Design a protein with these regions (language model features):
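GST-like fold's C-terminal all-alpha helical module
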Residues: 123-246
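Non-transmembrane alpha-helical segments in soluble domains
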Residues: 88-92, 111-115, 193-196, 200, ...
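GST-like domain detector, emphasizing the conserved glutathione-binding G-site
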Residues: 1-160
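A general structural signal marking secondary-structure boundaries and capping sites
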Residues: 95, 121, 203-206, 252
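Conserved small/polar residues in nucleotide/adenosyl-binding loops
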Residues: 255-257
Length: 257
């Protein structure tokens, strides 16, 4: 789990905060995952909306909390946690409520595998979102803002130079020049295909992605299919995923994401 060290954090005031604080953005798929976990466990938190369209995640203040400039970020009694899947696991370990992470070794291994796949696909999901859903003029970053983003914040996660930030900078600089070109779009679509096939087969034999029942893995992948459906992805060929998705959508706590 990604809990920042004291030396990673430059916005020092959050180290004195008490209670549960969640920095998030309503349209962010990663933020949606964490809000679902809080809702399922009936956990009250203090929300801090970070407007990604207005570049609030690139401010010195926010980069001092999350050196990557991503949402969500959890601050709990002065401890700072980043990365949505890690925050979900932290919630599961730290608070009362339904347990969404497995104890069975085989399920742990499979969950870690498919959670990493989901995380690795995030830039592809972002590319498809920007190609088909979000207007380019809203999401493209000004070069001056990118210059600030590149140097602001500590640049460290867990005391080490953060390589993830350079990946983010590269994505945004290319998009500022080229938008999301057709070849990138095709590559993004193809990147999902083998994993959707795997999940569709698995859901043919199980109601949920893990044999124990509903889990955080279902939340992670439901958010992906939710976004892909908004983008018009043809799920007709994945009937098991379609049925699973509709079952989850009927859960009230998942509808309000």
């Amino acid at each position: 789990m990604v809990k920042l060290l004291d030396t990673d954090i430059m916005t020092r005031e959050v180290l004195e905060w008490e209670g549960i604080h969640l920095f998030h953005f309503h349209g962010s798929s990663c933020s949606q995952k964490t809000r679902i976990c809080f809702n399922l466990s009936n956990i009250d938190y203090i929300p801090h909306v970070v407007d990604l369209f207005n570049g609030e995640n690139y401010t010195e203040y926010y980069l001092g909390i999350n050196p990557r400039g991503l949402v969500p970020t959890l601050v709990y009694n002065g401890e700072v946690h980043i990365e949505s899947n890690d925050i979900m696991r932290y919630i599961d370990n730290s608070f009362e409520g339904p347990k969404l992470f497995p104890n069975n070794n085989d399920s742990i291994i499979y969950m870690d595998h498919l959670a990493k796949v989901e995380d690795d696909l995030h830039l592809h999901l972002r590319a498809l979102t920007f190609r088909y859903l979000a207007p380019n003029e809203l999401v493209r970053k000004d070069p001056d803002a990118l210059d600030i983003y590149e140097i602001a914040g500590s640049g460290y996660v867990n005391g080490s130079t953060d390589e993830r930030k350079s990946i983010e900078v590269d994505f945004w600089r290319k998009m500022a020049v080229d938008g999301i070109p057709k070849n990138q779009t095709i590559a993004a679509i193809k990147s999902f295909e083998p994993h959707l096939k795997e999940i569709n087969i698995r859901l043919g034999n199980n109601k949920w992605l893990l044999p124990e029942g509903f889990s955080a893995l279902d939340i992670m992948w439901w958010i992906n299919t939710y976004r892909l459906k908004l983008l018009g992805y043809p799920f007709e060929k994945y009937s098991n995923i379609n049925n699973w998705h509709e079952t989850l959508e009927q859960r009230l706590s998942l509808i309000h994401i």
